[in-house]
Regions:
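Charge-patterned, long linear interaction tracts outside catalytic cores
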Residues: 326-336
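Flexible, low-complexity junctional segments that flank or bridge functional domains
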Residues: 20-210, 214-223, 279, 287, ...
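Alpha-helix termination/capping residues and helix-transition junctions
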Residues: 14, 169-171, 232
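Bacterial Sec-dependent N-terminal signal peptides
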Residues: 1-27
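Conserved acidic, small-residue-rich alpha-beta core segments centered on
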Residues: 188-323, 329
């Protein structure tokens, strides 16, 4: 079974469970929309136990705290603000409430983290004669180290693209894959890229699916495997560069790569976002999106809230002033050892 099929199997289960559940009907009133949102999260959000352990989240207490703020005559804008504040209690940057006029989101997960990326400085490394293979930009640095920048996994990464890219970089003594500021995209593209860095089937993580409405109703962890590509594969050291804006499918890419031989993760903690998403709609048409099926790395550690690098590095002001990227320079040193 391919890793893609194995990874997406729980989505079907989640959908089946949702379709078989009794659907509660709520009035399209401030109170009805509040009740609908609180219950949707209560029955489907998958990190309550983790959050309770981390900082003592009590979702029942949150209900009573915010119910007092709901009034029959409150405006749509006022209701949106209260519901957004209630979702903030989850402290989860991957929980969003969508309305026609705005999107409620929790941005504090970025706080305390430097940008650790500069497009202006990146030009210094890519130059003007770098090559482009669909979603990849690549070049060879002066010290004979290959460099690939992957700005997004929304752009197709085909097998032919990877053949050409890796063939051109085959003379290099090592490779840097930069996924900083990559907000994700199509997981299959991330898997296609990762499959070029292992010679065998590798366990890369686990996933659980919802089995009921209680906060702890999850299946036993099911393994996720990455199948090795049957085409040109890389056999030399690799450094993957990350920052807090590496999330969603990129977070999964980092999770996979850290399980592979010869790979070192360098930079800052990723932004997370590996849990399988679930969407639902409120009576007034607003929609909410959050993680409903938790995923873990190969050591059964949560990856939803970010993956720590093997070597933590921050860009320094001194290097910035000299047009240097501290994280890239560190990766070059690691490969050059």
């Amino acid at each position: 079974m391919s890793v893609r099929k194995l990874f997406h199997f729980p989505i079907v289960l989640c959908a089946m469970l949702a379709s078989c559940s009794k659907i509660e009907v709520y009035d399209n009133t401030p109170k009805g929309n509040f009740e609908a949102l609180w219950n949707i999260i209560d029955e489907r959000y998958c990190f309550f136990d983790y959050k309770a352990e981390e900082y003592g989240l009590d979702w029942d207490a949150v209900y009573h705290q915010y119910k007092r703020k709901i009034a029959d005559d409150m405006s749509s804008t006022g209701l949106f603000e209260v519901l957004g504040d209630m979702l903030d209690e989850l402290r989860d940057g991957h929980v969003n409430l969508y309305a026609a006029h705005d999107v409620a989101r929790y941005w504090n997960f970025h706080e305390g983290y430097a940008a650790n990326f500069s497009e202006e400085i990146l030009v210094h490394y890519l130059g003007t004669d770098y090559k482009i293979a669909s979603g990849l930009r690549y070049t060879i640095l002066p010290d004979n180290i290959g460099y690939i920048y992957v700005p997004s996994f929304s752009n197709s990464i085909g097998e032919g693209n990877l053949d050409e890219c890796l063939h051109a970089l085959a003379i290099c003594r090592g490779l840097i894959i930069d996924v900083r500021d990559n907000g994700g995209g199509n997981l299959s593209y991330a898997e296609t890229l990762a499959a070029r860095f292992t010679n065998e089937r590798v366990l890369t993580g686990y996933i659980c699916h919802t089995t009921g409405k209680e906060h702890s109703d999850f299946s036993s962890p099911e393994p996720i495997y990455l199948e090795s590509s049957d085409r040109l594969r890389w056999q030399k050291p690799v450094c993957v560069l990350t920052n807090r804006s590496s999330y969603s499918a990129t977070n999964d890419f980092v999770k996979i790569m850290r399980s592979l031989p010869l790979v070192t993760i360098v930079g800052d903690r990723t932004g997370g976002g590996s849990g399988l998403p679930f969407s639902s709609e409120l009576p007034n048409g607003w929609s909410v999106r959050f993680s409903a099926c938790p995923s873990f790395d190969a050591d059964m550690r949560h990856t939803e809230f970010g993956i720590a690098p093997d070597i933590h590095v921050e860009m320094t002001d001194e290097d910035r002033s000299r047009g240097l990227d501290t994280i890239i320079e560190t990766a070059r040193q690691i490969i050059g050892q």
